[in-house]
Amino acid sequence: NYVGGSIQKVNLNTGQFSTLYTECNDVSLKGPNDIVFDKNGDFWFTDLGKVRERNMDRGSIYWAKSDGSEIREVIQPFMTPNGIGLSPDQKTLYVAETEGGKLYSYKIIDEGQVEKLSFPISINGGKLLNNEGGIKRFDSLALEKNGNICVATLINGGISVISPSGDLVEFVKFDDPYITNICFGSQDLKTAYITASHEGLLLEVKWDREGLPLNFLNK
C-alpha cells in the first residue's frame, strides 16, 4: 500500500535500511525518482509526484544533505521531473522532463541553490536546453566526460545525446521503445549499461566516448 515517498539509505555491510527524509517543510515527498551526488557528498533528486487515474501531482527538485540534517525544495513546480545530473564542473544541474520530452539546465549559484529564469521566459525557472519535438518522452540520464548529456528516450526508443549548448549530437536507436536508463561502467568508462524496459533487458553497449565518472563511485 502506498504511504508516500521517502529517501532511504542502506548499510552495505549489514543490509540495514534507515530513512533520511519523508517530507520537506511539512510537505510529504510523493515519488522520489532519480538522484545525483555532488562532490561534497550532498545530493539532488527529482520527485515526479503521484500519478492517479485522472490527475497527477506537480513535481519538484530537491537538494539534501546525506546525513539527514537538511533538505530543501529548490525547484517547484516542475511537471514530471525525471532524470537528473551534474555537469563535469559541478556548476550546472540538468533535469529531464518526461511528458514533454524536454531537457532543462540550471546554473548552480551556491550550496543547494540555483539561478532561476523568470516567467514567461521559463515556466519552471530552468533554461530550456533541448526540445527536439515529435512524439517522445525523456527518462533518466547520464553524462559523458566531455559534458554531453545522454538521455534515455521513450516511444522512439533510444539515447538522445545532447551537447551542453542544447544541440542533438546523435540519437542512438534501439529496438525496444522503452529505453529508460543509462549509466557508464568498465575500466575506461566506455561501456554503457542501458535498461530496455519493454523487453525487461539490461543492455551492455560499447560507447564511442568516455562517460563522466560519478562522485564517490567511478574512481
Name what the model sees in each region.
Residues 9-16, 62-72, 146, 156-171, ...:
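Flexible "stalk/tail and boundary" regions
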Residues 180-219:
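Blade-level signature of beta-propeller repeat domains, shared across WD40, Kelch, NHL, RCC1
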Residues 1-5, 49-59, 98-101, 154-155, ...:
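Short, solvent-exposed loop/turn segments at conserved positions within beta-propeller repeat blades
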Residues 5-8, 59-62, 102-104, 158-160, ...:
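A short loop-to-beta-strand structural motif that recurs across blades of beta-propeller domains
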Residues 1, 6, 25-43, 60, ...:
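Beta-rich, blade/repeat-based domains predominating
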Residues 10, 106-115, 205-214:
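Short loop/turn segments immediately following beta-strands, especially the blade-tip
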Residues 18-22, 72-76, 114-130, 170-173, ...:
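Beta-propeller fold detector
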Residues 101-102, 106-110, 119-169:
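Loop/turn-rich, solvent-exposed surfaces of beta-rich toroidal or solenoidal domains
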